[in-house]
Every structure is written in structure tokens, then in C-alpha cells.
């Protein structure tokens, strides 16, 4: 019967394109690779049965070795083979083998026993590949993948850590040999030095991998390196077969290793437990022995007599706590940890619990450790108490020495200081300083009383505590007490001497102070009097000189009392001299409170007496001069009080004449000129006032209470009066010119003046913008409050106030009103005239201007007219329109 291999029914460990029914022959290179690989693979299993094949298509023809191969790789017994040599026997044996393969779930397609018996290479290789797939590859599964994919995934994972290895398939990914080397190195790194391999040397890499696999891994050499390198795409089946051998080789080794590891693990656990038991016993013994040796040392309470010895014991105890005990604490802790760990491991490994030898249980060790800590606590308390006791003695002794040394240092030189006689030659301030210093010393002495008492108390306590050096302490304490009593007596004696001297010097000091208090103001009074008597006074009025004279008389009246004060001050000085002579006081001879001597007082007093008559004479002379100045003031004031109002009156009359509208302009002009003549005739009075003013200046008179008018005011008023009358006459003359030039009637002029005066409410002769606007409206001008009205008013203001002064004069008002009411020339009229001269053209030529106008006016126009640029322009054409508007200020000329 024929068996066919179905590639779709083999758990996807064959790709669909690998169809053995195709008629095409195998690639010769692939066939060669498959022959070698499959032959080597078969021999790797047949050698277990003591045989092998040489020619794959010949040696399987009788079916005997084929059945043997299946028994070896499956581990099962097949049906008994036929031993005959006939074709039918061979076909029967091959069918038995094929039936066994089919019984394993492999559907064979197009593979029949006859082709195998006939030595068909293609069918024989296909059959072997089917066997390899079923028994070498099908059972490979990684993360639920198919056989081929599982084998590929296994290769990828094993080679992932290696550089230059990227396994993606079972053909070209293996050509450089690094994939085979990586698999070997991953499982047996000692067999290959992977770091020395080169990607560009595939032959060496492949031969290295094949040789090592054959020699050390018992994997036969199934491929030739030259065939793989020389083939563009190595045969996939050959590569898969070879790689599966690596998989099974390493898988088997891993199982053996796992078994060995399991045994080693069990033994290691047992050995570790035994070691832990031994360690526990030894550690427990050592720790208990250390506790046994340490407790007697801690229970030793023999006291020491010196602080140094006790401190050494304390240092030894600190070393014990710092150096010796911590390791033992760690050992005790480790002992308990080891015991618990050991019991846990024994329990987890189903071993019996560990029972330490007698007396070495954890509880026994804890009890011993508790005894150690109890002894340690008592020892530490005893040490500290002993140290405190010795420390107290040392502290008291040191405290006594320190206080005694401080006291002795303080008393050094104090007795000699208290016996000094420095107060006999001291001044009062020095005596007071000595008393203050002595009081400070007494305070210091009182403060040291506590220290002396403390020294005695410490000495007493040292005696009570049987201090070894008590005799020297007592001797030193007695010396300090004796010296203290002597200091007290000397202190009292010095205080009494200082107080006696102070009382005597205070009497003298009080006299000195009284002298200084009275001499200083008297001296100041004399100095002030001398300054006043010699002062060069400057007065401007008779009242001022009278005030100075009165003050001087009052000063002279105080001179008798001043002389009495002088004599009293000199009496104080004489009393001091008497005391010094009587009690033989050692004085410096100078008053500490003042530098003013009696001689100085007498000298200044004599000088004051000499200055008084000189002052009398100076005041009399100044009084006469001020009387003359007063006469000049009255004379100037009388004239100024007449001229000033006269100028003001004339100014008001001129303003009224310019505003009022009596008669014609010619009448007003005549009136003003007569007025001007009367003003000019007043000039001699102004000149006379100037003369009086000159006399006042020469007399240095700067103010005049008899008038509010100064010469400067008169001059300014006079000049303003002359200017105003001249300006007013000029305005009237201009109004006459305007009236005659514009043809304004007298009635119109009067109307304009009436309107202007009505809105000139402050009589300043000018109108502000708002006043001017109201005036225009009253005259019939339509100026609205909208934008157009504002623009029109702005245009009018630019005419009447071209300099933007913010006011409109009556002359500007008349000019504007005359322009608005009279028939005057305009720019349009001039343009119309030029157009007539130009023959109704928009431009005019030079020849036409020279023909129609006088020569000078023609040249004037030619020089100022701009060229005409219109479309109808001819050469030399001039623009008379822009020229006409420029004449009236409506554009730039």
C-alpha cells in the first residue's frame, strides 16, 4: 500500500511550500547537504544499536535498518521484520516502518514502500525528514509555539545576548557560523572563546562549531562548512536537523544537570544544617565561657584611693562596653538567629528539630546574659558613685585653691594702697575721686566677704571629709582670714581721713563756685556793655536814635548796682585767700570753675567807665543828622503825594476819552492833543521831585513813611502816561485813516465802538476770544457752535490776532469790520482781471504781462509767478491763479 505525507496535518512543523509531490528535482547543493545531514543524523541514533549506514538511499532499501532506526529513536518495539531477500520481503519491512510512522499521527503523502525499495533519493530523503520532524522536532515547544517556530524561538533566545547573531530562519541566518558557536558558548562557554570569532570568517566559525560539537557534545558532523558557505541559501531541512541535535544534546545535559543539582541541593542542605549545629554549639560554648569569666570582674567592688585609679577602672569598663561587649551582643543575636534559622530549615526539609547539648539552650544563654547585665549594672553604679565621691573631694580641693588664689591675687598690694597719704595734696575733685574710688573698693571688699566665707566653708568641709592635705589647707585659710581683718581696719582709717579733707576743700570749693557763678555773668555783662558802647550803630529814623538814647540812659542808671556786684565778687576771692592762709591748705592757687581773675574784672570795669561819655557824644551827633533826614522825607512826601494821584487821574481820563464816543474822530484827536500839551507842561514838577529824591539818596534814606510813592513809581507812571497819550492819539489817527480808506461812516464807527465797549467789561481796551465772538454775534454774524462755526471763528481769529496773543484790539476789530462791510478788492477779482489780460486763458505769458502792465509791476509778477503745469500749457506759461491767492495771504507767494 502507498503512504502519503500530508504537510497540512503535522502540527505545522512543515511549511506548505515544502510539498514532496512537486515534480521538480531538489537543488543539487541542497540534496548534497540533506544526504550528509540526514545520514549523520541516522548514524547518531543507529550507533546506539551498534550499526550505521553509508548510503542513505541504498541502506534503507530492505527496511531492516529503517525499522531499527525507528525502534532506537522511539524506544518502542516494531513488528518482527521479514528476513528474506526478495523484493516482497523488503516492501513488507518498509511498510511496517511506514505503518509505525503513520501510527504516530503522521499522514504520509506520495511516499510508498516501492520508491524506498527502489532507492528513490527524493522519497528516501523525504521519509527521513518526516522521521526527523516527528521524533526530533515535533516535541520541541517553547511558549505554545509549533515545532519549527519553537525551535527557532529557542535559538533566538539562546543567542540573543551575542553580538552579530540574528537568527530569523533556518537557512541564511546560520551561514556565518556565529549562530552555532553562540549556542555552544551559551551552554558550554569553556569550549569556545567567542570573543575571538569574526563575522567575516564563516569557514573558521562553522568548522570550529562542528568540530567542538562532534568532539565534546557527541553531535556528529552533519554539514560541511564549505557547502554552507558556497550555497546562497543553505538547505533549511539540513540546518533544522543539525540544530535539533544541538537542542536535544543541551536538553539532555540540562536534565542530567538538574538531577545532579537536586542531589547536591539535598546534600548541601544537610551539610549546611550540620554546620549550623556545629557553629551554634561552638558559639554557645564560647559565649557562656566569656560570660563566666566576665561576671567576677564586674562583681569586684574594691575601692581605689585616687581619682586616677578610679578613672582607669571606668576607662576599662568603657572599653568593655565599647569594644568587648558589642561583639558578644552580636554573637548572642547571631546565635538566636542561627538557632531559629536552623530550626526553620530543618522543619522545611522534613528533618527532626535540633536539640542543643545540655546547658546551651537559648534560654540558658539568655539567663546567663541576664546575670551578666545585672552585674554590669551594679558595677557601673558603684563606679559612678566612687567617682562622684573622689570627684567631690578633688573638686572641693581645686575650688579651695582657685578661690584662695583669686583672693590672694586680689589682696596683693591692697594694704600698701590703703596706707597712702595721697589725699594730703589732692584737690577737691581729686578727693572726691579718691572717695569714689574708696567707696568702690569698699563695695569690692564687701563682695569679697562671700569669697572669704566660702574659702573657710570649703576648708571646713575638706576637714570633715578627711582630705589628705588638710594641714596645708588650714594654714592657708588662717592666713587669708588674718589678712582680711587687717584690710578692714585700714579701710576704715582711710575713709575717715578722706572725709576730713573733703569737708575742708568743699568749703573752699563752694566759695570758688560762688565766685565763678557771679564773676561769669558780671564779666559777660561788662563785655556786652563794652561791645554795646563801642558798637557803630546805623539808624534811619528819628525814632530809632531816640530809642538808642533812651537805652543808653537806662544803662547808665545801672552802673552803681554793677559796681556793688563787682565789690562783692572781689570779697569772695579775698575770703578764699584767708582760709588758705589760715589752714595751710596746699592749693594750686587757681579757681577750677573760672579763669576770670579779680585783676581782669577791675580792668574791664575801668574800661566801661571810659566808654560811657564817648557813647553820649556819638548819640547826640546822630540825633541831629536824623532830624535833617526827617525834614527831607516830609518835603519829598508832600510833592509825591500830589504828583502820584495826578498821574493816575490823567491815565484814567485818557482811557475814558479813548472809549467814549463824543463828537467825531477829529474832535477826539484835537481833544487828545490839547491833553498831551497840558501833560508836557507838568514836566517841571517832575524835575523838582527828582532833585529832592537825589538829596534823599545822598543822605542814605531808604524808606519814607510820609508817602507810598517812590521815585521809581513816579518815573514809571510818568513814562506810561506819555506813552499812553501818544498811543491813544495814534489809534485815533489810524481809525481816521481806516474810516477814510474804507468809506466807513461816522455812524458805523460809533456802532463799532459801542459794541466793542459793551463787551470790554474790564475796560482793558481789548477783547478776549469769547468776548470777541459775542461781539460779532451782536453785530449780526452767524457763528454757530458746531464744527463749521468753530472753523469759521478760528479763521476770523487768525485775521484779527495773527500773532496769537489771545486778545483783539479795537484797531484790529475796526480793520476786520471795515473789510467785511466795505467794497474791497479780493483774490477772485484779481484773478478775473488777469484772465482778461490773458485772453480768457488759464495761464498768462511773459509777453502779455510786459505788454499790459507797467515795466516794474510786470517784472514783479514775472519774478513771483510759478510756472503753469496744466495740460493746455505752452512754453513759458505762468500760473496767475496761485499768484493772485498768494497776494491775499490765501497761499504762499
Curated annotation (Swiss-Prot):
Ca(2+) binds at residues 760, 762, 764, 766, 771. InterPro entries: Actinin_actin-bd_CS, CH_dom, CH_dom_sf, EF-hand-dom_pair, EF-hand_Ca_insen, EF_Hand_1_Ca_BS, EF_hand_dom, Spectrin/alpha-actinin. GO terms for molecular function: actin filament binding; alpha-actinin binding; calcium ion binding; LIM domain binding; phosphoprotein binding; protein homodimerization activity; vinculin binding. GO terms for biological process: actin cytoskeleton organization; muscle cell development; sarcomere organization; skeletal muscle fiber development. Spectrin repeats lie at residues 275-385, 395-500, 510-621, 631-734. The modification Phosphotyrosine is found at residue 13. Residues 32-136, 145-251 form the Calponin-homology (CH) domain. It is found in: Cytoplasm, Cytoskeleton; Cytoplasm, Myofibril, Sarcomere, Z line; Cell membrane; Cell junction. CDD domains: CH_ACTN_rpt1, CH_ACTN_rpt2, EFh, SPEC. One of its GO terms (cellular component) is terminal web. Keywords: Actin-binding, Calcium, Cell junction, Cell membrane, Cell projection, Cytoplasm, Cytoskeleton, Membrane, Metal-binding, Phosphoprotein, Repeat. Residues 747-782, 788-823 form the EF-hand domain. Belongs to the alpha-actinin family. F-actin cross-linking protein is thought to anchor actin to a variety of intracellular structures. This is a bundling protein. This is Alpha-actinin-1. It comes from Gallus gallus.
